């Protein structure tokens, strides 16, 4: 009887965990605008962005959401991130200028990373140390964006002199992963955010349309033609790239 009770409890806990996950399936479409005191020219390929969502899975090819040089698309599966990077032009340029690399491939590579959920446990704990940041989730402040209830969050970031550079973000709790590694671990999907680009320039991305159900499994497949390197080979390639770029900059 005790075993049956334990099994039933485990099933209920599992169901609770499943219910806690977001089940939204669709596309979040954004408009990117220059909103600073100094105007910026935003190319068409940047001005319109989108993220495809299927529960905890995200996929985007939009430049505004891609980190790292040469990134062409990012796939998120919960805490796992897979980036397709095209370094072919950079490698060709450096090789033309006399640089040599151990790596002999085309430059189209896959970079994988899996985050530890413990890394995000302290993100909403106040931390004012220089060089640190934390998230302040503001209770009671909401607004509607693209038909969704958006909740307020402020990212407090402290420079080396201890000065806070707050950034306000409005996000949905009903869309995307509970820990969104595409956006540094926030608890949902950003719907609006203004980013300081320096010298009076700023970019604001805002969700303008949320399309439900218009995604399929094939939308979350990586493109062909990319190779996966070992961790050591990937580390060596990036170290050599950094070294060669620094040498060119110093000339």
Functional labels for PLM-detected ranges:
Residues 1-23, 28:
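Bacterial Sec-dependent N-terminal signal peptides
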């Amino acid at each position: 009887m005790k075993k049956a009770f334990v099994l039933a409890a485990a099933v209920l806990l599992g169901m609770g965990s499943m219910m806690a996950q977001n089940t939204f399936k669709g596309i979040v479409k954004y408009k990117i605008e220059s909103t600073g005191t100094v105007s910026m020219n935003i190319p068409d390929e940047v001005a319109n962005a989108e993220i495809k969502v299927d529960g905890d899975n995200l996929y985007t090819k939009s430049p505004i959401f891609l980190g790292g040089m040469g990134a062409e698309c990012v796939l998120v599966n919960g805490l796992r991130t897979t980036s397709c990077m095209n370094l072919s032009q950079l490698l060709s340029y450096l090789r033309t200028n006399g640089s040599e690399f151990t790596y002999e491939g085309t430059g189209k590579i896959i970079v994988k990373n899996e985050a530890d959920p413990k890394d995000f446990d302290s993100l909403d704990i106040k931390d004012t140390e220089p060089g640190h940041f934390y998230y302040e989730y503001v209770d009671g402040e909401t607004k509607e964006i693209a038909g969704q209830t958006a909740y307020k969050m402020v990212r407090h970031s402290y420079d080396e002199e201890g000065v806070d550079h707050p950034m306000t973000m409005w996000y949905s709790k009903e869309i995307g992963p509970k820990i969104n590694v595409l956006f540094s671990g926030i608890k949902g999907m950003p719907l609006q955010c203004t980013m300081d680009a320096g010298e009076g320039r700023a970019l604001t991305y805002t969700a303008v349309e949320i399309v439900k159900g218009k995604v399929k499994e094939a939308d979350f497949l990586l493109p062909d033609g990319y190779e996966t390197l070992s961790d050591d080979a990937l580390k060596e390639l990036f170290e050599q790239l950094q070294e060669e770029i620094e040498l060119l900059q110093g000339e």
